[in-house]
Amino acid sequence: MSDSKIVDTAARSSTASRDSARPEGRRARRGASTLSPGDKVFLGFTTGSALLIMVILAGVAIFLIVKALPAIVADWPTNSELHAGPTLAFGSFWAYVAPLLWGTLWVSAIAILIATPVAIGIALFISHYSPRRLAGVLGSLVDLLAAVPSVVFGLWGIIVIRPFLRPLGDFLNHYLGWIPLFAGQPSTTGSTILAGSVVLAVMILPIITSISREVFLQTPRLNEEAALALGATQWEMIRLAVFPYARSGMVSAVLLGLGRALGETMAIALIISPSIIFSSRILTEGSNSQTIAANIALNFPIATSLQRDALIGTGLLLFVVSFGVNILARYILGATGPGAASRRTRRANKAALSA
């Protein structure tokens, strides 16, 4: 048979298969559109619930914008109401919010640096090293850790972490005080950025651990067995087969943990002795950068009307930053994480059938 006949036969068979598939697709779509009354009620309920979430989110954003505008556009140097309390000595709204944003990002970054290697280590142990029964127990404990209230973590930080880290702070300042990070007079009470970051790291540990564990478990078994069959050790198999597959998932887990850290309030407010300044020191007391959430919690009850608008404005900035971080994490996990390729294949097949 000639090449032209083969191509013609293949084209006819492809056309026939598409023609035979189209009626089935149309029947399936017609069947899906013919819903019973109960299904229609349930569909309306679920659709309304999804729309309600969007309405609530939009309502929160509109509220924050409307309440923050008076403080954002106010003339701070000439407004007497802004020359007292939490807004004293600031020439504009942006001069007020900039050190708060720095403090929020600084504390969260240190917490992420502490929590990420520990969380990934726990996730690897649960998914690849521990016995099945122990893995179940450890997984449950990690999930339960996420349910502990923030104020409990704050009290634990005051009673346990601050006294525990005080000698470490003296040691770091004595031997590494020439580094700006450890410079300054060490705190005598332990109310430092380091203590707050350690507590915050423990609080975000369950998020990073749980997501990383699930991503590690989704690594194709054939990839792992192929690496082991080539003579790789357990660690080499993880490094060559698991980590490349789970890289985007780990990044998303870290970003979601960062989103939690950015909005944490009570633990930071209880532990750190802050000021609204730019500071990178982690061992000092009284000259620590304040976070947005803790500043709102501490000053909102005593603030005047316009000062509250300024605090709400800082909350608007935190809302935007946290929302952006979470969207980025979801996008990375959905676009390049485990299952993304299969989802793209399903969408391509569906498009081909409907063509």
Predicted features by range, described:
Residues 111-142, 329-338:
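Transmembrane-helix boundary motif in ABC transporter permease subunits
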Residues 144, 148, 208-215, 219, ...:
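Transmembrane alpha-helices
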Residues 28-45, 64-111, 131, 186, ...:
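Periplasmic/extracellular loop-to-transmembrane helix junction in inner-membrane transport proteins
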Residues 74-98, 153-202, 273, 283-286:
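Membrane-interfacial helix termini and adjacent extracytoplasmic/periplasmic loops
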Residues 1-50, 329-355:
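Transmembrane alpha-helical segments of polytopic membrane transport and secretion proteins
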Residues 213-221, 228, 297-355:
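C-terminal transmembrane helix and the adjacent membrane-cytosol boundary/short C-terminal tail
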Residues 261-305:
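Glycine-rich helix-loop "coupling/hinge" segments at transmembrane-helix boundaries
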Residues 95-125, 254, 323:
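Transmembrane alpha-helix signature in integral membrane proteins
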